[in-house]
Amino acid sequence: TQKFLSITIIKILMFAPKKMFKKDEFYKYAVKHRGISSLTLHRYQSRWYGSMTPYIIEERQLNVAQMDVFSRLMMDRIIFLGTGIDDQVANIVEAQLLFLESVDAKRDITIYINSPGGSVYAGLGIYDTMQFVKPDISTVCTGIAASMGAVLQCAGTKGKRAALKHARIMIHQPLGGAEGPASDIEITAREIQKLKKELYEIIAHHTGQPYKKIWQDADRDFWMTAEESKAYGMIDEVLIGKKS
C-alpha cells in the first residue's frame, strides 16, 4: 500500500552533488520549529496534491526510493503554490522557504504560481518571508496569478520573474466586507483602505509603475497576458518552449 508522502524529503545517498536533506526533515522542521500541526500538513497535502499525485521511483546506490513528484521537486528547491491562499497554505509555504534557506542560503528558490489569490493577510505573510530569506526567489506563473497571487508573482527577485506563454496575471483592489455596529464597519473600511494602499505600493515598487497608475488600473479587475505582464513590469521573461 502506497503512503501519501506530501512533503517527504529523501537524501540522495552517496552521489548527491548538492546539499540535500534527510527523509522527513522538512516535516520535522515544520512541526517542531514552525509550530505547524501534523493535521494541518495532512489537510494541506490532501487538498493540494489530491489522490492523483504521481509517484516516481529512483534507483540509488544502496536502495530504491519512492516519493511523490512534489517532494522530489522540492529537493531541487522548487515550491508549488497551486491553490487559493489562506493561513494554512501560507504557513506551509513560509516554512518551506525558511527550511530551504536553512539548507543552503546561497542557492535560488523557485516558486511556481497558479493561484486565484485569497487572504491578503496570509499572502502578505508569504510576501514578507520571500523578502526576508537570503536566497533569490524566482517566480514562474503557470496558468493564473490573480489578486494576491499576482502580488507574489511580481515580488520575485528582479530579473528572475517569468510566466508561461498563455498565463494570465490580474490585479485588482482588495475585497472585504463587514456587518455590525456602524463604528465596526468604519474600522473595517479604514483597514481595507490601508491594505489597498499597501498592496499598491508593493506592486509599484516591484514593477516600476507609478503608484497613481496602479491605483487607476486596479480599480477593477485588470487582466494581462504574459507579454502584457512583461511590458507592465510584473515579470521579466515569457517562457516559450522549444516546440513553439
Where are these regions (language model features)?
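Terminal-region recognition feature
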Residues: 12-244
